């Protein structure tokens, strides 16, 4: 970078915006990022920005230079060492020499960040204001930016104490003077020549006011009449003449309304309320007429007004709930803005208000208010149903259709809010009236479908004791005119009310018949698939929620499934099997085995028939066999043992479980499917479910399953075998929950050791440069290790031949894996191990009140002392490279616990950690002494005072700063 020329930067910028190859663009981008981090960037950017450019021929170059300076001030001030005063002067000079808005904004951000970080600069804001006074437009821009920058400690390298102290020093002395300056700008605006270089705009004044609004109590701000009048007058003038100023005023008033949330000054709220209502009367005079809003008013005007009323509604939700007589007109405005606007994106702005309003109104103390507002919520139900209606024509694109469908679910949440307020009967009456009207008038399917959809979304809020409206609705639905889309919608409605049906068995038969008919009436039609999907989904819920009522229907249900399964997709088959599982589970003990066997026999016959085809074409047929195995998995969804333990009685389904395992073992071992990863994965999934559901009742098949899992994993290395092995550990290692003999528990420990040894042998053969290719196997291994730590903590910690290799694998993998599930699994496993180094056990267990000293010594010696330095290094590297933000808490937890144990082992003296911190920083590189010392100070002080939050926050702040400074892209 030493011989860099300005022309090199121009060439790179041109390349990025040209038609050059992506490879060339990436190289240009990399070059520019290297430049932005270099020391020479300071002087070159100054050189670029110092050149006159009257025709804006070099605008892109100048913007890049200004952005680079902003980033340099943010991250690289340490490069300037003792030259900060000279840079400050040059930055102010550059600021006054430019008139392009984008450049001025970037330089002002740089100036604000410099003022915050350059602690030796005394009274910086007064100096800046004095210098920029002759250029009010630039000064306004700076003053707008300054408070925004004081919100973000992440854009500085300061400690929290330094940052907060500096902010008070910069903001507090000038806050009231800024308001006076803004008032003077109003006069200047009225008298200035719009073409002068120092001219200011109404938008600038309002944007600046918006930034500073947070610095004052709302009561104080509202006393500055010239500014408040300006806000309301600008909005009152509408958005036709000055759209930017209108938007700025809307933003400003939204802040004021938001800040009024906590005020107890009723006069203030009353005054704002009246001003809002005056704005509505002025700008939306026909809001309450039948005229369509979007035909009469500009979309941006409607959006702005919606934002204002929503902001007020959310801020005053409690007082609105208390005073319906006073605030009802405002709620009516929100009702109209919700129901009459065709722009559904803007309509959605109102949804949080309705939710929060509902939260208040359902409280007992607002019972009278709820009655007063009920008519509004009834109208809201009807307005939402209208919005739910599909358009009569086609959507312009698939994207538009998907967006509308997603939006319907959000609108459904509002209907739930309405139902909670007006009550079950009143809420149900609204779609019922519309359905009856649609039938009488023979309306299009769109008009019928919308109220049906609304019924679907209301279901969770409907009382299970409702006995008047819902029976009528159910009967009407089951006799609706036949139309595919109506059939689809009505079937889904029935599926949502199955809990209600369980309390009203007299309506079960008619609903089941309606659903069964749906499979037959539309067979062969283009809509058949969607109807089958809806019917299967509904039947699943009927079987689940009405399982006891359906005990006598089991033969009919099974025959129905066997008849239709060949004509329905696998997802629908799966859902039906899930539903059947619930009904089977409620069968009498004497019958359950025979009934279950009927479905099992059919399934296994189909698998057996597929085996010869699979042998001929495994790639094509393996998924089909796997799907059939998945149906067995679904059949175990609701099945449970009849007794808690085998000593209480024999399990009637155990012979069926043994039968299933024998058939699957034949497929896997005799037919050779144990080397087919797709089939093995589904079998592992099924076995896990069987063991989780029937736990110790499965002991008769345990030896055979364990032998198969050992042999299968040894032969193939498939992670599924490890994943399934974990379920054996969870069941037969848990001697507190189940009657497990010591010999059986020990046998499962030896089984687990064998699986771990096989993984470690396999891992040593992995290509370490391609670890991401093995992430699934790594997840399965560390999931198994987590199970071992949970149920065999002592055996695991004292097994040095296992503990050491596990740590080595973890440290080699954790920051090299891109897969989130993989590295988070390792992090949590490491955390589990380290947590046993404290006196209090990390799990709730009857048998261990205090962690044995022998276990703790193992953690101290074999984990912290032997691997701790490397552990925190790899975790720090992961924190600044591969780990997503959501994994940071887990990684930092491991680091802090490791340092805590090290400190405790050193007679509670945390200075021993300094050397580790310094080594980490040295390995990371590109860390200033100040940044290093701030990290070490936060860690040591926090550990010594047992303020572990301080340690975590110190590490988090360092990681965030390091990533932004050295890792994240600076190029915009």
From Swiss-Prot:
One of the protein's GO biological processes: tRNA import into nucleus
PANTHER family assigned to the protein according to its UniProt record, in alphabetical order: MRNA TRANSPORT REGULATOR MTR10, TRANSPORTIN 3 AND IMPORTIN 13
Purpose of the protein: Involved in mRNA transport from nucleus to cytoplasm.
Disulfide bonds: none
Organism: Saccharomyces cerevisiae (strain ATCC 204508 / S288c)
UniProt keywords, alphabetically: Nucleus
One Pfam family per UniProt: TPR_TNPO3_IPO13_3rd
Gene3D superfamilies according to UniProt: Leucine-rich Repeat Variant (1.25.10.10)
SMART domains in alphabetical order: IBN_N (SM00913)
MF annotations from Gene Ontology: nuclear localization sequence binding; small GTPase binding
Name assigned to this protein: mRNA transport regulator MTR10
InterPro entries, alphabetized: ARM-like, ARM-type_fold, Exportin-1/Importin-b-like, Importin-beta_N, Importin_beta-like_NTR
Localization: Nucleus
GO cellular component labels: cytoplasm; nuclear periphery; nucleus
Miscellaneous note of the record: Present with 6340 molecules/cell in log phase SD medium.
């Amino acid at each position: 970078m030493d011989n860099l020329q300005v022309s090199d930067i121009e060439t790179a910028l041109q390349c990025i915006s040209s038609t050059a190859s992506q490879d060339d663009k990436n190289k240009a981008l990399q070059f520019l990022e290297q430049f932005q981090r270099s020391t020479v960037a300071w002087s070159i950017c100054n050189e670029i920005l110092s050149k006159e450019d009257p025709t804006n021929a070099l605008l892109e170059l100048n913007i890049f230079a200004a952005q680079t300076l902003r980033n340099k001030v943010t991250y690289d001030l340490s490069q300037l060492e003792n030259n900060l005063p000279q840079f400050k002067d040059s930055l102010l000079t550059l600021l006054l020499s430019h008139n392009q808005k984008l450049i001025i904004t970037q330089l002002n951000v740089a100036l604000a960040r410099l003022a915050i970080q350059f602690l030796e600069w005394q009274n910086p804001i007064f100096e800046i204001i004095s210098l920029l006074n002759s250029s009010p437009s630039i000064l306004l821009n700076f003053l707008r930016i300054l408070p925004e920058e004081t919100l973000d400690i992440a854009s500085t390298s300061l400690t929290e104490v330094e940052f907060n102290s500096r902010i008070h020093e910069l903001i507090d002395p000038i806050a009231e003077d800024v308001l006076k300056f803004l008032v003077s700008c109003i006069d200047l605006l009225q008298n200035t020549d719009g073409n002068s270089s120092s001219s200011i705009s109404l938008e600038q004044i309002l944007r600046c006011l918006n930034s500073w609004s947070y610095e004052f109590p709302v009561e104080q701000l509202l006393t500055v009449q010239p500014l408040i009048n300006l806000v309301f007058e600008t909005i009152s003038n509408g958005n036709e003449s000055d759209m930017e100023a209108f938007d700025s005023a809307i933003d400003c008033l939204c802040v004021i309304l938001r800040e009024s949330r906590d005020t107890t000054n009723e006069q203030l709220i009353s005054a704002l309320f009246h001003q809002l209502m005056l704005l509505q009367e002025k700008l939306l005079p026909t809001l309450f007429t039948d005229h369509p809003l979007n035909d009469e008013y500009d979309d941006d005007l409607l959006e702005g007004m919606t934002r204002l009323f929503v902001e007020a509604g959310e801020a005053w939700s409690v007082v609105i709930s208390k005073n319906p007589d006073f605030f009802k007109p405002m709620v009516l405005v929100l009702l109209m803005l919700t129901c009459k606007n065709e722009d559904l994106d803007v309509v959605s702005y109102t949804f949080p208000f309705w939710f929060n309003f509902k939260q208040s109104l359902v409280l007992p103390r607002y019972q009278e208010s709820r009655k007063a507002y009920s008519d509004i919520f009834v109208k809201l139900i009807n307005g939402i149903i209208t919005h739910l209606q599909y358009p009569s024509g086609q959507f312009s694109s698939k994207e538009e259709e998907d967006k509308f469908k997603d939006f319907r679910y959000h609108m459904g949440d509002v209907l739930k809010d309405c139902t909670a307020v007006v009550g079950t009967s009143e809420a149900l009456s609204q779609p019922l009236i519309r359905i009856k009207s649609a039938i009488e008038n023979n309306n299009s399917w769109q008009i019928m479908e919308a109220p049906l959809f609304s019924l679907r979304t209301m279901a969770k809020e409907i009382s299970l004791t409702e006995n008047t409206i819902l029976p009528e609705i159910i009967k009407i639905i089951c006799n609706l005119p036949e139309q595919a889309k109506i059939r689809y919608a009505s079937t889904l409605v029935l599926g949502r009310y199955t809990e209600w049906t369980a309390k009203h068995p007299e309506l079960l038969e008619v609903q089941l018949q309606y659903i069964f008919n749906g499979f037959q009436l539309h067979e062969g039609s283009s809509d058949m698939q969607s109807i089958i999907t809806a019917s299967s989904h509904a039947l699943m819920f009927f079987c689940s929620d009405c399982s006891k009522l359906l005990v006598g229907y089991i033969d009919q249900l099974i025959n129905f499934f066997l008849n239709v399964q060949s004509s329905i997709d696998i997802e629908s088959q799966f859902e039906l099997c899930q539903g059947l599982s619930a009904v089977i589970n409620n069968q009498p003990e004497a019958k359950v085995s025979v009934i279950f066997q009927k479905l099992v026999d059919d399934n296994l016959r189909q698998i057996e028939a597929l085996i010869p085809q699979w042998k001929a074409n495994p790639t094509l047929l393996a998924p089909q066999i796997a799907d059939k195995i998945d149906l067995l998995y679904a059949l175990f969804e609701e099945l449970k043992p009849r007794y808690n333990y085998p000593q209480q009685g024999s399990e009637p389904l155990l012979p069926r479980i043994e039968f299933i395992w024998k058939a699957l073992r034949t497929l896997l071992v005799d037919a050779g499917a144990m080397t087919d990863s797709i089939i093995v994965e589904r079998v592992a999934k099924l076995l896990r479910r069987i063991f989780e559901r029937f736990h110790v009742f499965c002991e008769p098949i345990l030896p055979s399953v364990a032998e198969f899992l050992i042999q299968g994993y040894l032969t193939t290395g498939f992670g599924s075998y490890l994943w399934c092995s974990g379920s054996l550990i969870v069941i037969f290692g848990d001697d507190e929950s189940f009657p497990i003999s010591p010999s059986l528990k020990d046998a499962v420990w030896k089984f687990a050791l064998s699986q771990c040894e096989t993984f470690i042998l396999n891992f040593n053969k992995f290509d370490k440069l391609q670890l991401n290719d093995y992430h699934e196997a790594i997840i399965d291994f560390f999931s198994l290790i987590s199970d071992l730590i949970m149920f065999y903590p002592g055996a695991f910690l004292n097994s040095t031949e296992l503990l050491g290799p596990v740590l080595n694998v973890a440290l080699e993998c954790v920051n090299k894996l891109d897969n989130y599930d993989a590295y988070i699994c390792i992090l949590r496993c490491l955390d589990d191990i380290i947590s046993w180094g404290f006196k209090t056990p990390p799990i709730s267990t009857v048998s261990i009140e205090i962690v044995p000293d022998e276990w703790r010594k193992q953690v101290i010696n074999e984990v912290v002392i032997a691997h701790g330095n490397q552990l925190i290094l790899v975790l720090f590297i992961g924190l600044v490279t591969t780990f997503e933000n959501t994994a940071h808490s887990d990684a930092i937890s491991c680091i802090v616990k490791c340092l805590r144990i090290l400190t405790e082992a050193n007679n509670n003296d945390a200075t021993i950690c300094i050397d580790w911190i310094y080594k980490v920083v040295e390995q990371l590189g590109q860390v200033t002494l100040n940044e290093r010392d701030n990290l070490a100070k936060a860690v040591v002080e926090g550990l010594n005072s047992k303020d572990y939050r301080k340690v975590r926050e110190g590490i988090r702040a360092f990681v965030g700063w390091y990533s932004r400074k050295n890792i994240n892209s600076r190029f915009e």
